[in-house]
Amino acid sequence: MDVCSKNSNRTAPVSEGGIRRADVPLCSRTNGWSWPPHPFQFLAWLLYLYFAVTGFGVFVPLLPTHWIPAGYICTGITFVCHLFMHLMAVSIDPADYNVRAKSYKGPMPVFDRTKHAHVIENCHCYLCEVDVGPKSKHCSACNKCVASFDHHCRWLNNCVGSRNYWLFLNSVISALLGIVLVVVIASYVFIEFFLDPSKLRSDKHFQQVRNESVVWFVFLPVAPVTTAGPAIPALAGVTIALGLLSALLLGHLLCFHIYLMWNRLSTYEYIVRQRHRQEAGDSRKPPPENDSGVPKLNLIKQQVSYSGTLGYTNPEMEVEDPKAMTSQEGAARYGNGRIRCSSEHMDEEEHLPSVLTEQKASPHPHKHAQKKKRKVRKLAAEVNGDISIDTSTAKGLQKTSAEKESSVAAATVSSSLGQRLPFPAFPLRASLPPLAPVQAAGPPAEYHSDSAESLEEIPVAMARLGSAALAGAQIPTTTATASSSYSSMLQCALPSSAAGHAAPSPQPRTKRKTAARTVSEQRFEMLYHNPSMFMTRESGEPAIPPEESPRAAKRKQTGKKRNTEDAKPSSRVGTSLA
């Protein structure tokens, strides 16, 4: 067995510790009859002889008389076919055509991997020293290139290629059929031996010993040999066990090659593909946990408060860690360990939508209800130049970053599921308003109405809807001029009683509560205000109070209207109803 364990036909370089015998030539094997034989080859021959002897010599002669010819013919054909196919598959040289054309009876060189990475490169074998086909492979067991290499069969002790593949496949099919027939006959003999032994004693030799039922004959009818009765079921049981095991293995091999033919693969290609899949599966497995405490940052999270999908993931994206943000012990950091300075924090708060600012500024629910009733829409705007960078704080944070790096890293690992993105994946579609004052497009068309009862019903020049500017910005000159022109037209159109003072609105006026305005609300608001002007009786000209806010002017105008109403009767008293 030591001869079979050592493969002298090796293609790999000999190790430094190994001793290479100079008198042993490294020759190529021609076919399955070349030395040395494989143990599986001997086992295949022994199994073939066993099933042939037991089938034709013991079980088929014990069959009923009318079944004996069918048993010999069917079983004999399968065994003969298998023997022919097996011998042909073993005897054929499956080498490549150029290898067979060249005499390879001499010793083969040992492959040196320091010169070439592979034995066959660009369809040239550096061991056989010939050009081979694209599907030819150099078999290390046979030490030669095999045309359309499939696999090296140890039962045949020969390579299986394009020249002997169908012979190999037919030998498998014939062996499977022959073993199945032998198992069926042995099972019948085993069962009838216990049920009705007389059906197995139909031969003329059993008629001579009719009274002695314990005597049985084997190898009938040519060379009858007397044996004991229990030997027949014992031999049948062993044959059934070996036959079932052999049929299972041969059936699995046949199904495997049918699968390969269906997918147009060879055994070698299938093994290589499975190896690649196994390596790919091992690479997908998560690596072992790192004990050094380096934080593992997961940039993609499923629970994100914005809508849309990320087209790609930028590995340099800064993601905030909530535990690092809310930590009271250390400085505020990003999830990747970088320190967040105060200026960056303020910029992020300004770039957030105004809805988030309203939620932070108004924690009470009744203030939210008042804002919904007002229906004031606000848009986010960038304000440049009103934020000062605290350099001393940034330097202090950078000094403490090295001391608390390990604690923040551990918190980042434990809170990977709670990370959030401080900005949406896509920018807002609303365009940012310009920082310059908004000018009116032009004076509107002349307004004519006989039902105008107050100045609030007369349109004034306003900015377009959707424009935004800083709160407290001065009204442009063009807007003031347009307002004065409106008042002059009103003075000509309205009667003298209405020009003196403004009539009260028919709708009841409710006093609105002035809620506390936050800094963010004062910073951004729409330019939707009534013009701060009032009418005087003496001059009849519109006057704009200097340096007064819109709300103060409105309160002053409302108070004056009420005083006038108390002093004089309403202008609507003497009006006749139509």
Swiss-Prot record:
Residues 121-173 form the DHHC domain. GO terms for biological process: antiviral innate immune response; positive regulation of NLRP3 inflammasome complex assembly; protein targeting to membrane. The keyword Transport does not apply. InterPro entries: Palmitoyltrfase_DHHC, PFA4/ZDH16/20/ERF2-like. Residues 363-376, 552-561 have a biased composition (Basic residues). The active site is at 153 (s-palmitoyl cysteine intermediate). It catalyses: L-cysteinyl-[protein] + hexadecanoyl-CoA = S-hexadecanoyl-L-cysteinyl-[protein] + CoA. Pfam families: DHHC. GO terms for cellular component: endoplasmic reticulum; endoplasmic reticulum membrane; endosome membrane; Golgi apparatus. Keywords: Acyltransferase, Endoplasmic reticulum, Endosome, Golgi apparatus, Lipoprotein, Membrane, Palmitate, Transferase, Transmembrane, Transmembrane helix. Residues 63-71, 196-230 are lumenal. One of its GO terms (molecular function) is protein-cysteine S-palmitoyltransferase activity. Residues 278-298, 345-376, 497-517, 532-578 are annotated as: Disordered. It is found in: Endosome membrane; Endoplasmic reticulum membrane; Golgi apparatus. It is a multi-pass membrane protein. The chain crosses the membrane at residues 42-62, 72-92, 175-195, 231-251. Its EC number is 2.3.1.225. Residues 278-288 have a biased composition (Basic and acidic residues). Residues 1-41, 93-174, 252-578 are cytoplasmic. Palmitoyltransferase that catalyzes the addition of palmitate onto various protein substrates, such as ncdn and nlrp3. The DHHC domain is required for palmitoyltransferase activity. Belongs to the DHHC palmitoyltransferase family. This is Palmitoyltransferase ZDHHC1. It comes from Danio rerio.
